[in-house]
Amino acid sequence: MSRQLISSGSPFEPQIGFSRAVRTGSRIEVSGTAPIRDGKTAAPIGLYEQTKLCLEIVAAAVIEAGGRVEDIVRTRVFLTDISRWEEAARAHGEVFRDIRPACTFVEVKRFINPQWLVEIEASAEVA
């Protein structure tokens, strides 16, 4: 089975040794995606804005791997403050209101960069 690696240009990809997304067959897995724009943390911006940026990066990776946003079947939203889940949910709902993938919101202690408030993982199945 062929394996396609997708990079978003994050400086952490070569440092840690991971891909933004990996496609094997019809499956696309998107790594935990932080609010990084042009190789730098997009901060200080709020949780809603960070979530929107993460979702844009996730969508771009899925599209680059030959999928569509509509092919996303699962998302995992990691937050440093679960009491603010509605801010992230608003951004998530704007993208996925009609697609409605399986979704989990989880609180974590912190991320690599303390300015990050959210990271998002996704799985897609290309029809």
Where are the predicted features?
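Short, polar/acidic, helix-capping and beta-turn segments at strand->helix junctions
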Residues: 1-127
